[in-house]
Amino acid sequence: MQIQIQVLNQDELTQVHERTLRILVHIGVRVESAQARKILGDAGAHVEEKRRIVRFPQTLVEESLRLAPKDFTLGGRRPGWYWPMNHGDCTLLADGEAKWVVDAETGKRRTGTEDDWLKATQLIDALDEIGVYWRMVSTPPPQGKPRGKVAYWRNVFTHFTKHVQDSTETVEQSRWLLEVLQIVFGGREAVKLLKPFSFLVCPVSPLVIEGSYTDAYLQIIGWGIPAAIMPMPIMGMTSPARLISTTVVGNCEVLAMLCLVQAAAPGTPVIYAPALATTEPRTGRYTGGAVEHALLSIAATQMARFYGLPVEASTGGTNEYIPGIQAGYERAINWTLPTLAWPDILVGPGLFEGSTVLCYEQLLLDVEVFRHCRRLHLGIGTGKDQWLEEVIARLGPGGNFLKHPSTRDALRLGEWHLGTLGEPEVFQKKLGLLAEARGRINEILAARKPLPLDEDIDQELVNIERRAQVVVG
């Protein structure tokens, strides 16, 4: 049977839901967007305009949950690539927004560059285990300006061919984004059908739906673009100092935003995606390596399944800033448990030190950890062809199973997971794991087959970029 790990039983999941309803009904959420308050008020929420507090009747929450699709498929530009949500498989989403990069030559930390962004983007595009894009390196150009955003999206869709998850900061940026999506994917209806892009929307903890980003999101409503709702409550800082209460706060924030999404455009796909986190209590800093991240991630996955919603789970990372023993054990613990809860999307490969430092070698090592976790999830098969009683009877006491065809068949069918890094001959050659990973990265990038945009599409994007430049002067 497959392994499906849990940290909350059915009664505890129900308690999270019921306590969430009480908070939404009696305490509410501060909604900074006037447009969002009006949409929610029209849908039946109780709006206290002066304090910008919105309270959500239980009937509104339950109807919004009913309206949210329980399964849909994410697409991308690559022909034949798609990712069905809520269909029993898991893909990786590359972690994002690193400011620094571990230099492959010196091993030292330096500021990330556009070349780093390009290398990281091409690498994750080439790795089959990574199906969803975030910007791994926060690049220097002024991304806040429309021209910078259009140029950025042109580069994204040129170099990454699977599913893109991103956001905008302003209504104006959202308008440019919709133009880009129409050009790249062939119009509004094609975007609605293919779902090549999902919008990351992040309520602010505790219990705030902020203004600018929410208005930016509402600009794309009606295009069928999935909303990945990712509040980031931090235990002991922006949520109470208990794992279960942090789970409740995150759930409140997701459901409040889900109500807004469904009120604005019923049937819009939603991804349940809270990034529940904790701190280092001795310093107050966010700590990626704390084992509690794994527990919180599993709880979030379970709540999504409780509602029947697709889920994007965030793992913990590591407190370390270079590859090594600490990074290894923190990653293994914080990845194995959430993966065994089996979300649709798992966020996290490639970054160190609270998701601020990119390391290419660690990215590849994280993918290898995920491959091992995926094998663990499969568990022990017990189908009728798995027991091999007839083979045991045929070979009998003292028999040699190594040369029997059933052993070969089991190997070919995946009964063993064969790792691709850290093979014995590597150590005999005294390469070391990082050197091996570095060599493998070069091989992957050399073998990658680019899928450039059609010339006419690329030229139209250039034209949009020029128009955006005129707008900003």
Q: Could you describe each region identified by the protein language model?
A:
Residues 4-19, 27-28, 32-39, 361-473:
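Catalytic-core signal marking the mid-to-C-terminal active-site face
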Residues 36-42, 274-280, 314-323, 352-356, ...:
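A glycine-rich phosphate-binding loop feature that marks nucleotide/adenosyl-phosphate handling sites
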Residues 11-16, 28-41, 48-50, 88-93, ...:
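N-terminal glycine-rich anion-binding loops that anchor highly charged ligand groups
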Residues 200-366:
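Glycine-rich anion/phosphate-binding loop at the beta-strand->alpha-helix junction
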Residues 11, 15, 31, 35, ...:
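Conserved active-site and cofactor/substrate-binding residues in soluble primary-metabolism enzymes
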Residues 53-240, 244:
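Catalytic alpha/beta active-site cores
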